[in-house]
Amino acid sequence: MLSRRIIPCLDVRDGRVVKGVKFRDHIDMGDIVELAMRYRDQGADELVFYDIGASPEGRSVDYAWVERVARLIDIPFCVAGGIRDVETARAVLHAGADKISINSPALGRPQLISELADAFGVQCVVVGIDSIREEDGQWRVRRYTGDPSKTQALPMRTLDWVAEAQRLGAGEIVLNCMDNDGVRHGYDIAQLRQVRALCRVPLIASGGAGEMQHFADVFDQADADGALAASVFHSGAIPIPELKRFLRAQQIEVRDGQ
């Protein structure tokens, strides 16, 4: 069994880290580089940066802060936001990112997944999926969630998109459970279990962490490979070293940290 990964998520807007609830009402959480260095020192396994305005605004990520982060941390990090083609992805990786993540652009042009996998290898290609439960009880995909005024509800079922993304070459899936985002009531175990049943690549759970037991639950009950969280880390409610000690005490294998 591979070690489970603890992954702080940093949503970036206008050069700052922000955090919202259910992808809305974002507040400032601090400087990108300062937070990245804090999590490096605390023993995070990797970091994910989402430039949440890039896709809705039709632009690419700001390479300057990617380069600054790469110079100062020695843990893997993934960058998402406005990556629509191989050239942009190459620039992000050249700036120092270890992986790139695509979400809305892949929904508009699914072949982008294959193009990136062919160019850089599947290990570099993460597909993020923003999923919400609709009135009919089905989980469906949304895009442009970084800007509530531009968010689009799509008819595609989440499970169908997970299967298609893998077929096209996704090397990892990050499932952002929008109903649970920022509310700290726990991960969406029911949805994650369904996705896990058909997901052959690493699955990262996102949305809902509020206490240490929630991390244990998502590893034990949904068999997630990693758990991504934001507000509980940014606020200091859950220090990563304490979280790892807690998980080890429950016989969950995690990488050594502080």
From Swiss-Prot:
Catalytic activity: 5-[(5-phospho-1-deoxy-D-ribulos-1-ylimino)methylamino]-1-(5-phospho-beta-D-ribosyl)imidazole-4-carboxamide + L-glutamine = D-erythro-1-(imidazol-4-yl)glycerol 3-phosphate + 5-amino-1-(5-phospho-beta-D-ribosyl)imidazole-4-carboxamide + L-glutamate + H(+)
Keywords from the named record: Amino-acid biosynthesis, Cytoplasm, Histidine biosynthesis, Lyase
Subunit architecture: Heterodimer of HisH and HisF.
Any Pfam family the entry gives: His_biosynth
Name of the protein in its database record: Imidazole glycerol phosphate synthase subunit HisF
Active site positions: 11, 130
Cited function: IGPS catalyzes the conversion of PRFAR and glutamine to IGP, AICAR and glutamate. The HisF subunit catalyzes the cyclization activity that produces IGP and AICAR from PRFAR using the ammonia provided by the HisH subunit.
Pathway membership, UniProt: Amino-acid biosynthesis; L-histidine biosynthesis; L-histidine from 5-phospho-alpha-D-ribose 1-diphosphate: step 5/9
Family listed: Belongs to the HisA/HisF family.
GO molecular function, one term: imidazoleglycerol-phosphate synthase activity
Organism classification: Bacteria, Pseudomonadati, Pseudomonadota, Gammaproteobacteria, Lysobacterales
Protein location: Cytoplasm
InterPro entries (UniProt xref): Aldolase_TIM (IPR013785), His_biosynth (IPR006062), HisF (IPR004651), IGPS_HisA/HisF (IPR050064), RibuloseP-bd_barrel (IPR011060)
EC numbers: 4.3.2.10
Any one GO CC term of the record: cytoplasm
Gene Ontology biological process terms, A to Z: L-histidine biosynthetic process
